[in-house]
Regions:
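Conserved beta-strand positions
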Residues: 31, 51, 165, 198-200, ...
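N-terminal pre-triad scaffold of radical SAM enzymes
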Residues: 138-161, 188
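Iron-sulfur (Fe-S) cluster-binding segments and ferredoxin-like electron-carrier domains
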Residues: 163-179
Length: 236
């Protein structure tokens, strides 16, 4: 439902909405996150899709782009180089999409050699070693998610067939209790929020939930900080 907002953002930035109309001076328009797992609806408007987890792959892409700026490469040559180097980057302009008669995708073919096919989703192996923003901007006004949010586990053990995230975020990767406590204390010290949300696709499946809650209560009850579970299965 937010696809039109993406186009509006590009237009407000005074960047040509159609990727094919962007010239040498235009910035790259990159999309990622959960919705990028199905990129074709936005393929005409996005230069590069970063498929999968971005904590490690996005900084790598940025460093490659910075290095290319020192070379005399055209915009298209840079896109080709990124798509050939990073196995989780999808550049729609470099692929041909073949459809069945019912408009479902039959095949995605690279237009040039050296491109990954299929494109693999990036996956962070250890959440404890990835960057986590512990100094988020605190708004002047009250927002809907007016709290600290910490992802305690990525992936889900349930395997519900209807759930995109549960199927695409495999395998399950939990943070350690120590890492969660450390992040919670840093975020609290930097924001002063009075609520901490422990986020996961199914928080009740976190393997060390009892010990985590004991530690969180010990540290944060004296500070009058609430702990919330935003995703609980109804049968648990």
């Amino acid at each position: 439902l937010s696809y039109t907002n993406i186009l509006n953002m590009i237009d407000l930035a005074e960047i040509p909405v159609m990727a094919s109309e962007r010239g040498e001076t235009e910035p790259l328009v990159i999309a990622g996150g959960p919705t990028a797992i199905s990129p074709e609806p936005l393929a005409d408007f996005i230069d590069l899709f970063l498929i999968g987890d971005g904590e490690e792959s996005l900084p790598h892409l940025v460093e490659l782009w910075k290095g290319m700026n020192q070379k005399k490469l055209s915009r298209k040559e840079k896109i080709v180089s990124l798509a050939q180097t990073l196995k989780n980057v999808y550049a729609p302009s470099l692929y041909e999409v073949i459809y069945h008669q019912d408009n479902t995708i039959q095949e995605i073919r690279p237009r040039i050699s050296g491109l990954p096919s299929p494109i693999r989703s990036a996956s962070v192996r250890d959440l404890n070693k990835t960057y986590f923003p512990t100094k988020p901007i605190v708004p002047y006004v009250k927002t809907i998610h007016d709290r600290i949010t910490i992802e305690v586990m990525r992936g889900c053990t349930q395997g519900c067939r209807f759930c995109q995230s549960g199927m695409s975020k495999r395998p399950t990767r939990p943070r350690t209790v120590e890492n969660i406590i450390n992040l919670a204390e840093l975020c609290y010290a930097n924001t002063g929020h009075n609520e901490i949300s422990l986020a996961s696709l199914s928080i009740s499946d976190y393997p060390s939930l009892k010990r985590l809650m004991e530690e969180m209560n010990r540290i944060f009850i004296p500070r009058h900080v609430n702990i919330s579970f935003p995703s609980l299965r109804v049968n648990e």
